[in-house]
């Protein structure tokens, strides 16, 4: 059956850096540890032949995707899909996490992590994101039985994918870690998350 490899880009901060909530308006490159994560992903998938590769316009996803497909002779062209761009965190964009929590509260952040309910002020069209993921899965049904496609995005976007697949693990944590991936298998019109939050 066909597979989609859903990857979250590597780190944009290293140990000792002030970590901020980096959204779609903040275009940071991968940090040193993020580049190492991209290399680890590339090595892990070195024997995987991707028939298609997609990412957002953001540097961090492009760098991660290019590392992963750059290992392959005859690799597919990297296609930018705007919907894969990280969400806009509104007034919390690029703010330190303690300031974000102080503004929205722990309960709002937990609702975002648990069921993807956007906090007040974040510019997130959850229904539209679910619909575009659903459309992508429908298109993926046309892949060949042995085909594998790569999709590199950000955590705020990937978290809406589990809402539209047909089958997923009961204990799935929708948050993808940096440099981690999930696997969606497509069998006809049925989609199934078989793995999530894996790292090399």
Descriptions of predicted regions:
Residues 10, 155-156:
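Active-site metal-binding loops of divalent metal-dependent hydrolases
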